[in-house]
Amino acid sequence: MKYLKKADKTAESNVLEAQKVVHDMLSTIDKNGEQAVRDYAEKLDGWTGDILLSASEIDEITADVPQDVKDDIDFACQQVYTFAKAQRDSIEEFHTKNNGVEAGQRLLPVNVAGCYVPTGRYAHIASAYMSIATAKAAGVPCIIACSTPYKGKSIHPYVLYAMKTAGADHVMTLGGVQAIASMAYGLFTGKKADIIVGPGNKFVAEAKRTLFGEVGIDVFAGPSEVAVIADEDADPDVVAIDLVGQMEHGHESPGWLFTTSDGPANTSIPTSPKRVLLASATNLLPGPTIISAFLPVNKP
């Protein structure tokens, strides 16, 4: 087996550095409140505009979203909402009484849900309706959505339209740790989130992990991983899309491409991000064997 390309490994020191950065930021925001958030928004994202967007501002920003894009987002929002509502309706409340012991199950939505939608490197439109529409279907009375300023401006128009369509009650132009802290501490809206959901980089993930206990979270997510095995008949576009679909989650999300020849590799690599480790083997081992060799933590 030979390597056609190798990606650098992530140093453990990077994780420790992220923990320290997040700890310091959360402490500063907890102490100085909204002003600290504004300072971080300007320092990290170059944003000095309104944090909490009004309905008229949202309408203005989304006015030029192409109709075909609106139609696609409308369709996606409805699909997610319909499924989530059916899922919610399939879970029933019940009450039992046995030998003097009463027990049961009640379904109560949280009061406030915070939905984080990253747009730092890519505009994750799907993250908007997957979180907000689901919360809406669950019956959450107040939904707060946050997204990073996009290219020095307010929230990406497509993402903002998705937030609006999915049913966000409050929208804040905030990204990163300052967004997570603002939702957890109830800054700008006066509503403290009971749960915070949504993907993000290592700083966002660390902020959610640190605040867990004060606020509920969906999951502490690490970097995504993907491994693709392709022979000479594989469609290079499909291979590239499968790789990018996971690696877009962050520049520390590794991707592996194993091929039986150089052909698929040479065609797929140019359309994939730089952080891809690629191995070409003359005789391809069985899939689970070769994957386990590189991903021992995921062994069956």
What are these regions (language model features)?
Residues 167-254:
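Conserved NAD(P)+-binding/catalytic subdomain of aldehyde/semialdehyde dehydrogenases
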Residues 1-3, 171-175, 293-300:
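Short acidic-hydrophobic, aromatic-tinged amphipathic segments that line or gate anion-handling sites
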Residues 1-111:
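N-terminal Rossmann-like NAD(P)+-binding subdomain of aldehyde/semialdehyde dehydrogenases
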Residues 141-151, 255-262, 268:
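Short internal beta-strands
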